[in-house]
Amino acid sequence: MWCVAELDADYIAKLEDVLALYERPYRPTEPVVCLDEKPVSLHADVRPGRPARPGHLAKRDNEYRRCGTANIFAVVEPQAGRHFTRATPDRSAGQFARVIRDVVAAYPAARTIHLVLDNLNIHCEKSLTDHLGERAGRALWRRLTVHYTPKHGSWLNQAEIELSLIARQCLGTRRLAALTHLRSETRAWNTRANRRHTRIRWTFTRKKARVKFGYQRNPSTRSRT
């Protein structure tokens, strides 16, 4: 469900900017990368389950033990079908900085990397300079052209679709008790998705947005075409 708190000038400008980015033809030297994150609860079985056998489904006890939480950074280049999902101990500025460092390293020939982010407080240059050093952090941030979604507009971030794919195809209803297990599962999912070049087909355009939300394009609205 879309949550649009207020369709003001700032919301429309950022909406149009992100949608204009998605409408651009694929440019290998200017990849469009989307990033989002979500917490993951770690659970362990109290008693071992029963595996499936002919004529019988697998069974699992309802009781489980809480083993803390972890985090998943979903990073995807939708048009190229490149996936960089990573499991981390937490959703901290330091972890974000290291993920960005790895994303930039994956595109050594890019003129710029268009990065779509929501407005979480760690999604900023300061996270990089604080945890990677002033010089290295600034150099990495300069490799990026950041496109922030509007407030209450995170549905515009295709990384949310990536998180949904991970939840259904990777995590499922299984219980993962440790970060090491979560990491091995997400790495395996990355490998499969990258081998298949799994792409996200985004169909919501600026034209559709203007009809859906009933606004006219403002000549001063920022867009990159």
Which sequence ranges carry the predicted segments?
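C-terminal domain-tail junction helix/linker
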Residues: 5-6, 46, 181-225
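RNase H-like two-metal-ion nuclease catalytic core shared by retroviral integrases
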Residues: 70, 118-119, 146-168, 180
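Mobile genetic element proteins and their domesticated derivatives, centered on retroelements
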Residues: 34-36, 75, 81, 100, ...
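Short, basic/hydrophobic alpha-helical segments
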Residues: 94-114
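Extended, low-complexity cationic-aromatic segments
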Residues: 15-101, 213-216
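Acidic/histidine-rich, metal-coordinating catalytic segments
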Residues: 111-124
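RNase H-like polynucleotidyl transferase catalytic core
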Residues: 59-64, 136-158, 174-176
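Active-site proximal helix-loop segment of RNase H-like, two-metal nucleases, encompassing DDE(D)
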Residues: 83, 159-178, 192-194
